[in-house]
């Protein structure tokens, strides 16, 4: 009888330990997903909001403040949802042209996130 009770106690203890371990694994996965983009994590190549006064694009995840990014967008750029700077506002023959992507205008967006004349 004592052996059966001991086996049952061991089984319950093992089951409890496995359950607790599973819960802790799930909890750590959840926290990893929630914290995969920490403030000031240097994974952005641009900045939200367009430098010193361009069009303000939607604030993308992982790129909430200028300090979250490796580099800052020049005026007129903003950070895309992929945390890449894209061109937004350029001057073409003294006319302001809005360009959300390179194909919207005759200019090309450089890797730094500003528009320059296509060479």
From Swiss-Prot:
Signal peptide: 1-24
Domain of life where this protein originates: Eukaryota
Keywords: Antimicrobial, Disulfide bond, Fungicide, Plant defense, Secreted, Signal
Any coiled-coil regions, as ranges: none
Cystine bridges: 44-99, 63-79, 69-83, 73-85
Gene Ontology CC terms: extracellular region
BP GO terms, sorted: defense response to fungus; killing of cells of another organism
Main location: secreted
Location(s) in or outside the cell: Secreted
Family stated for the protein in its record: Belongs to the DEFL family.
Name this polypeptide is given: Defensin-like protein 260
